[in-house]
Structure formats: structure tokens, C-alpha cells
Amino acid sequence: AAGLAALLKYPARFAGKKVGLVLGGGNIDPLLLASIIERGMVRAGRLARIKVSARDIPGSLAKITATVADAGANINEVHHQRAFTMLSAQNVEIELVIQTRGRDHIAQVLATLNAAGFAAAEQP
């Protein structure tokens, strides 16, 4: 902040010069910084939330996670929802937060899941 203050107070001194300001993070709350980075990853398509519908049978979750891994994405979070869904009683809704390489990669992961027999879609 001191560098910016000097620039604002003495603009004539820096006129016509290329000036760079160094910002330090000593007073930035780490949780706020983490939140900013995470939201930036979402906007860049590097972090996505997807919903996958599947039969609620042993091995379904393992097949879903293996399919995501085979598509080259990393799973950050898993939320397995049985009760609060409009799906039939034999099905389950699984919400995943995944790390990807970008928007095209998200589409690739979804296509791979759908090709494997799951109903998968990106969530806002």
C-alpha cells in the first residue's frame, strides 16, 4: 500500500515512466485468499461441480470415480445423495467437485461418464 500511496501523492515524479508496484500479502487473510483462488479456478474451468445419476448398487461409486480418473480429472469432493433426490429409489445422485484442465476437459469428463452409462451434467 505504501508504494501506491507514493504514486498517488507524487504523480508528477513518475510521469512518463513505467512503474511497477510490489504488493505484499502480509495482511491478507489466508481464508479470503483461498476463497478468491478457488472462485478463480471455477471461472477458469479448472474446478467444476458435476452431478452424476447412477444405480444405487455396490461398485457404482467406484466405477464413477475410476471413469473420472481415466478422463484425467481429480476429485476434490464427493457428496452422495440418496434421500433428497427426485430419482427413483433404486438410483442415487452423486455430486462431485473435480479439478480439470479447463472447459474442454470438463466436457470430456462429462462425455466419458455419459458414454459409461451414467447421466452426468455440470452444475452451476
Predicted regions and their residues:
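A conserved regulatory-domain signal marking ACT and ACT-like small-molecule sensing domains
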Residues: 30-124
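Short beta-strand segments
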Residues: 21-24
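Active-site-adjacent helical/loop segments in soluble small-molecule enzymes
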Residues: 1-17
